Amino acid sequence: MTPQVDSISSDSELPDTTEVVVIGGGIIGVATALTLAERGIAVVLCEKGIIAGEQSCRNWGWVRQQGRDHRELPLMVESTRLWEAMDTRVGCATGFVQCGVLYLEKTERDIAARETWLEHARPFGVDSCLISGTQANALLPGSTEHWAGALYTRSDGRAEPAIAAPAMARAAQAKGAIVLENTAVRGIETTAGAISTVVTEKGSIKCSSVVLAGGMWSGLFCKSIDLTLPQLGVISSVLRTRPMPNGPELSASGAGFSFRKRLDGGYSIAESRGPTIAEIVPNSFRFGKIFLPLAWLARAHLRPRLSRRFLDEWQQSRRWSLDGISPFEATRILNPAPLSGVLDRVRKSLADTFPFFKQLEVAESWAGLIDATPDAIPVISGVDTLPGLFLATGFSGHGFGIGPAAGQLAADLVTGNTPLVDPAPFRFSRFSDGTPIRPVVAP
């Protein structure tokens, strides 16, 4: 099932020329387009399906600094600041609330692991802290557990995935951006070795820069232009409840569950620290070696699965004529089936821990395919071998909250502005220049 997403009024006219084309209408793409449009840069966003149709509407809706890889923290601190002003910026509610985020822990060993993370986070000024089990129960009453403690970040929050990216897309349009849904980009053309044209299913657009923000599709697009982007996917299942009055305001996770209050009074619920389904596909063998450290880090939860998707990707074209149908038109929206066993398990775990949730009514459920890089941090970078091409992809399940700042950083790189943060950790070349690939946090 595809979650219901706020619609936008797609532009209909394909311009002959622009300065920047953004490929992909998830939160990263729309944040990039919005920032560029606000700076007076002519920008066209092309989305093969609908705005926020894939992972940008299927995620948990958490806006968190807590628990992130320290390489992401400077960008996430900036993103929190941008979220605080987002409703004013886009002229409507995005559901952003600084409700606080709580990681509930049962053992002293788990608390020690959180303390290690906290030591890395302190230099970035994040207001995360360890609290006692008694304090955790006071913040989040009604639990049957006696917690050893918790990691708590008061300034972390939540926003509404099905609303936020469309709101940003509409705001970009109001600033002059052209946003085209159902407009797949088939490829690019170059002049003297640099980007000069984007070819879509509806015609060509001359441009000087392209930002590829294609999520799970970015690796295939890169492959078609002789670039290697190591990328694999994991499946995440989520359910939405009907409104539940007088429930927790905090977003929280513990062993086996996570929950986030929604704008409509219901909750988005998913499994936390449980089995992670990684589908075996041809790229699993192509990129197996570089992903080994991440697989080892996630070994307690990683569950490889062979499915129909292996054959689908095996048969999928790696190259195609720019005047013929591309794979991006053949599949407008990735829509994996939610894993009912996972959702049954999380419902039981949550109800056992917080009896408030025993009477929940499921309104809908869905799954998303999360794109992951070998070190579980994104690529936000120019491509040295192809001037004019920039990548903003590989957010490894961390993209929604960091999206506004990631889009601004991508726009900074395109325009040559002083970068919002040091972009070096996110450079594309780290996968090929001998840099040790060391994941810190698994997706």
Language-model-derived ranges and their functions:
Residues 3-18, 31, 39, 130, ...:
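C-terminal lid/capping helical subdomain adjacent to the catalytic/cofactor pocket in oxidative enzymes
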Residues 13-28, 44:
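Beta1/beta-strand and adjacent pyrophosphate-binding region of the FAD-binding site
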Residues 31, 188-315, 329-337, 345-353, ...:
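Flavin-dependent oxidoreductases
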Residues 37-57:
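Glycine-rich FAD pyrophosphate-binding loop
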Residues 60-62, 156-158, 277, 369-371, ...:
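Glycine-rich phosphate/pyrophosphate-binding beta-alpha loops
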